[in-house]
Amino acid sequence: MGTRFLLALCLVLLVLGFEVQGTQLPKQDEPPSPALLSQVQESLSSYWESAKAAAQKLYEKTYLPAVDEKLRDLYSKSTAAMSTYTGIFTDQVLSVLKGEE
């Protein structure tokens, strides 16, 4: 497996993990509408809910505090690095746009 695949997999699992741990808000009943857009939205919502439920079961089954801590540490380090590199990139773009004076 490539590094990109593992990174993408970790990010997807991290997002699903945060979604699973998030607060559960009560759903409000909406009147049914025959519009195609609402049907697609309901279908996608049901797929997301089933994926979230599967992730919740997997999370509860395989929860390891050490791995969770490592993932959180990895996330914080990677976001810190990205903000640093974004700042460097922004400075470079601004210096190119500004030009030599």
Swiss-Prot record:
Gene Ontology cellular component annotations, sorted alphabetically: chylomicron; intermediate-density lipoprotein particle; low-density lipoprotein particle; spherical high-density lipoprotein particle; very-low-density lipoprotein particle
Annotated stretches, region: Lipid binding: 66-74
MF GO annotations: lipase inhibitor activity; lipid binding; lipoprotein lipase activator activity; phospholipase activator activity; phospholipase binding
Modified how: Proapolipoprotein C-II is synthesized as a sialic acid containing glycoprotein which is subsequently desialylated prior to its proteolytic processing.
Renumbered residue ranges of the record's region Lipoprotein lipase cofactor: 78-101
Coarse class of the protein's main subcellular location: secreted
GO biological process, one term: positive regulation of very-low-density lipoprotein particle remodeling
Keywords of the record: Chylomicron, Glycoprotein, HDL, LDL, Lipid degradation, Lipid metabolism, Lipid transport, Secreted, Sialic acid, Signal, Transport, VLDL
InterPro entries for this protein: Apo-CII, ApoC-II_dom_sf
Subcellular location: Secreted
Region forming the signal peptide: 1-17
Homology family: Belongs to the apolipoprotein C2 family.
Functional note: Component of chylomicrons, very low-density lipoproteins (VLDL), low-density lipoproteins (LDL), and high-density lipoproteins (HDL) in plasma. Plays an important role in lipoprotein metabolism as an activator of lipoprotein lipase. Both proapolipoprotein C-II and apolipoprotein C-II can activate lipoprotein lipase.
The protein, known as: Apolipoprotein C-II
Species per Swiss-Prot/TrEMBL record: Chlorocebus sabaeus (Green monkey)
Lineage: Eukaryota, Metazoa, Chordata, Craniata, Vertebrata
Gene giving rise to this polypeptide: APOC2
